Amino acid sequence: MYKRQDLALAKDAGFTDIVVDVRPTTGDVLFKTNLVDQVKFMYAWIGSNYTKVERTATWDYLQAFVDEARKQGLRIHAAINTFVGGNQIDGGTGLLYRDQSKAEWATQMNMQVGITSVMNTSESTKFFNPAHPEVQTFLCDLLKDLAGYDLDGIFLDRGRFLNLQADFSEESRKQFEEYMGGIRIQNYPNDILAPGASSLPATYPKYLTKWLEFRAKVIYDFMQKARTAVKGVKPGIKFGVYVGGWYSTYYDVGVNWAASTYDTSRYYNWATSKYKNYGYAACMDQILIGAYASPLKVHGTTEWTMEGFCSLAKDKIKGECPIVAGGPDVGNWDTNNQATQEQENQAIVQSVKACMNVCDGYFLFDMIHLKKADQWQYAKEGIKLAIE
């Protein structure tokens, strides 16, 4: 019943597409596959309480949304959290907690105390090592199962490294040394990044910029494989990603979502001349840009304004991806409570036109926030103004 109501509200507001998250950060799934467990519980807002809800139903969650979307004339896409395998929630949930044989899949962090498995850190989301060949094979196989559904598109979220401290495993070291022509790094990891460093130092260690280049290549190569996996099952499905618009610091997660013709090194000193070679925009049929600015920063030309995030992304992608849509996170955009409720409502209205005017479309993250605050009317008003 709820899916019918939710999609009807989205359709009435003027949305043309919905994206259904079918692999949360635990790494378990809400679609049919034999590769990993089904989601057994979720936390949801019930009234004013964030409550654990056990999943006892056995019906196909994704198929139910596909069926309802088709009835209502909406396009439907599935999204997965990609390089994740567990979450600390409920004492630890997900593949990395259940299956000790996959311990090497967990990303290795460059901590002050030494290189440490993410499983032994306070990071709540337990990431895989994106460079691990078995991880990549597992995820491509998972995507093949997902592509079997009647979907218009698939989006990869968290298709990245956890942060700048990842991944410093022996596997990544071996691959990097091979990438560098077979060198042996004598002072590892210090010649790349000092233990415990979580941001770029004033003086770059010997191999840091080549390491950033290598990480971008790891993600670029994976995206090519993932696209091939999806298109091999269903060539007509649109393949895409969901990324943050803050390109100026997105090196920290190893992602270059720009066009390969955008020469990053002309603008940022952390980028090598080869960094641009691993811009993966041309691999994508559609890209969602998280334009996650404050509700008080709708308009502008710089990062950390919604309009600026979208216009800068469109410029960097240079037409290599045909659909670039940006939009706000309306549930987490004012953590310091600087905006009034009316300012937030009007930011939703204004954000649609601000984003759509400078890129190819608009998305809103996410439906639960509109439902909780009963803000559908503001999305509807904004869409109407944007398409007039």
Regions inferred by a protein language model and the residue ranges of each:
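Short, acidic/polar
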Residues: K3-K11, P133-D145, A258-A282, M306, ...
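Catalytic domains of carbohydrate-active enzymes, especially glycoside hydrolases
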Residues: R4-D28, Y149-G153, K276-I289, C355-Y362
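Aromatic-lined carbohydrate-binding/catalytic grooves of carbohydrate-active enzymes
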Residues: F15-A57
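Aromatic- and acidic-residue-enriched segments that line the glycan-binding/catalytic groove
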Residues: L30-Y43, V84-M119, G159-S198, D252-D263
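Active-site-adjacent "subsite" loops/lids of carbohydrate-active enzymes
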Residues: H77-Y149, A197-L208
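Substrate-binding cleft/loops of secretory-pathway carbohydrate-active enzymes
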Residues: G85-Q88, L164, V233, K238-K297, ...
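Active-site neighborhood of glycoside hydrolase catalytic domains
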Residues: G148-Y149, G153-D157, L162-N163, D167, ...
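Substrate-binding cleft of secreted/luminal carbohydrate-active enzymes
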Residues: T272-E388
